[in-house]
Curated annotation (Swiss-Prot):
Name of the protein in its database record: Homeobox protein Hox-A9
Family matches, as SMART domains: HOX
Gene Ontology MF annotations: DNA-binding transcription activator activity, RNA polymerase II-specific; enzyme binding; RNA polymerase II cis-regulatory region sequence-specific DNA binding
Keywords per UniProt: Cytoplasm, Developmental protein, DNA-binding, Homeobox, Methylation, Nucleus, Transcription, Transcription regulation
Gene field: Hoxa9
Symmetric dimethylarginine PTM positions: 139
Role noted for this protein: Sequence-specific transcription factor which is part of a developmental regulatory system that provides cells with specific positional identities on the anterior-posterior axis. Required for induction of SELE/E-selectin and VCAM1 on the endothelial cell surface at sites of inflammation. Positively regulates EIF4E-mediated mRNA nuclear export and also increases the translation efficiency of ODC mRNA in the cytoplasm by competing with factors which repress EIF4E activity such as PRH.
Biological source species: Mus musculus (Mouse)
Length: 271
């Protein structure tokens, strides 16, 4: 209880008077021996003589000589930042940065930032790390002069990243090439022996209609007026004279008879 009360009084003095005044008072009022080993722990070690004392070797200094040692009063006194009492959750701003260990090594305070921390743009930093901050404020008129290969925050300030600006001219050229290929290029011929191609591109089996010439139509009309029905021999002769097939002559006569029948029916209705 005596040790706890001494530490509490020291912390109150350091808070009211400051770190330097508290160190001077602590050096004269509180001896370093008050923070030594408790008597209960010493008695426990004396009761177990079988266990050998600890023989760990002291480690090498973690940091080099660039760390400046604190003055004697601050080294002997206990820092207020290390002993954090639950009644005072905040730390005095003038707390010492480093404390001296018994073996001469200097331990780093937990209040300082680690060396691996990065400094962001717009935030104050205690030491430079060689990182160039990106400019956050950019006008829309400055965006076309920027290099499109460097990706920064100013590219997004203009409304579109550089990748989209590169795609726009390439898409226009691609559409022009497609238009030229569709207009100038012919489709590849379809293999008639391929059943898949025939099924996908189904075509009608009906032959293309070939109109008769005027001479052929005139001769067929004369033959129809002479006889509406042709015999097989006469059909063969007419097909040979007009350079047609017998089937073509036969179909023409059938169509001509249907046409004449329709005309006669229309005449009967008019009368």
């Amino acid at each position: 209880m005596a040790t706890t009360g001494a530490l509490g009084n020291y912390y109150v003095d350091s808070f009211l008077l400051g770190a330097d005044a508290a160190d001077e008072l602590g050096a004269g009022r509180y001896a370093p021996g008050t923070l030594g080993q408790p008597p209960r722990q010493a008695a426990a070690l004396a009761e177990h003589p079988d266990f050998s004392p600890c023989s760990f070797q002291s480690k090498a200094a973690v940091f080099g000589a660039s760390w400046n040692p604190v003055h004697a009063a601050g080294a002997n006194a206990v820092p207020a930042a290390v002993y954090h009492h639950h009644h005072h959750p905040y730390v005095h701003p003038q707390a010492p940065v480093a404390a001296a260990a018994p073996d001469g090594r200097y331990m780093r305070s937990w209040l300082e930032p680690t060396p691996g921390a990065l400094s962001f743009a717009g935030l104050p930093s205690s030491r430079p790390y060689g990182i160039k901050p990106e400019p956050l404020s950019a006008r829309r008129g400055d965006c076309p002069t920027l290099d499109t290969h460097t990706l920064s925050l100013t590219d997004y300030a203009c409304g579109s990243p550089p990748v989209d600006r590169e795609k726009q001219p390439s898409e226009g050229a691609f559409s022009e090439n497609n238009a030229e290929n569709e207009s100038g290029g012919d489709k590849p011929p379809i293999d008639p022996n391929n059943p898949a191609a025939n099924w996908l591109h189904a075509r009608s089996t009906r032959k293309k209609r070939c109109p008769y010439t005027k001479h052929q139509t005139l001769e067929l009309e004369k033959e129809f007026l002479f006889n509406m029905y042709l015999t097989r021999d006469r059909r063969y002769e007419v097909a040979r004279l007009l350079n047609l097939t017998e089937r073509q002559v036969k179909i023409w006569f059938q169509n001509r008879r249907m046409k004449m029948k329709k005309i006669n029916k229309d005449r009967a209705k008019d009368e």
